């Protein structure tokens, strides 16, 4: 178990060590080779790439170079992706056989491997992430740590303000103050229905009952959707921190993450993160000496599409057939085992810590009058830049597909885009100017 003073020391020391991850002008001789370990790049041999880098560095006796696994960088069309910091060099479609050349040319000789540098859709070489249109129009809140930190290292999460929001919540805020902050921010559920998050927390807190639960819906069933999976794989602790904040706010001491078994990397990293948080005293009894107890367990889903519906999910957690319940009563009144239960999805939770740290006014300044903040999209199909994007609410679908996604390949004409899976609508060229809002 770590004291608050120890956590502060970890944050201070580790943040200085990791400054080169976010600062291209960092004054350091050290280099970090970041290798994407999201599901897409993992399926294309990124673990082998990482091991080859480490082996070659060891064989050559090279110092001041670290090789780190990260979550998804977003531009899945260019994977496996390797980024070298602090210079921010972007190597695309790297193979295990390329590692020797990258080490010799880039690390030892100080030159880039031009044939591996990322190219935009016009064939122009791109030296860094910031030079790509894919990233220029994005604003990352839920994805802020994805591709930056090692999701299996709690110290790296702590270095980038991890668990500061939970500390502030427990030490400086009452449960009602937390709920008021979330309400004022204008955050709405990112699972599709768009119900005001703060209102849902308020209703669950107001429900009578000594036992309450916090549930994370990570059963992402829509075809082609990998937003929640990528957050769980790339910034796992952000979800745990938000669930603990939610538990404090509504009066719950137990949380469940319901995740489909088809997400083995996410499940593995969730368990690693939970174990680390318990070891540090961030989950368990008397967190931060506040008399607040909270713990989290994982529950695996069997892949049934219907279990993405919140009451069917609750039935599944209870060990029953995943079948939706008649509402009302709603989960806030009678949820898991008949107790008041708060349910939010992964992306919703991924915004919570940033709202607590930066304030409701900051969050509500992003987006539109009725839809605040950002939205994460999984961009797939016949588009040049397939991948994961996060944009402010109010961004048009045309901007997402053309300005960020690079448009339709081979100059072909756009026909239609589908949003939100089989239950949502198709947008034709005529309606393509519409903005996304909840």
Per-region residue spans from a language model:
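Accessory "access/gating" subregions that flank catalytic or transport cores
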Residues: 167-208, 364-365, 370, 390, ...
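Iron-sulfur (Fe-S) cluster-binding modules
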Residues: 1-35, 44-47, 51-68, 85-184, ...
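Local cysteine-cluster metal-coordination motifs and their immediate loop/turn environment
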Residues: 29-48, 66-86, 186-196, 305-307, ...
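Short amphipathic, charge-patterned alpha-helical segments
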Residues: 57, 242-246, 394-409
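Hydrophobic alpha-helical positions that pack around
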Residues: 138, 267-393, 405
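Gly-rich Lys/Arg/Thr-decorated short loops/hinges at beta-loop-alpha junctions or inter-strand turns
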Residues: 35-36, 149-164, 216-228, 331-336, ...
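Terminal amphipathic helices with adjacent charged low-complexity linkers/tails
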Residues: 95, 103, 124-125, 254-275, ...
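Histidine-anchored nucleotide/phosphate-binding helix
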Residues: 235-249
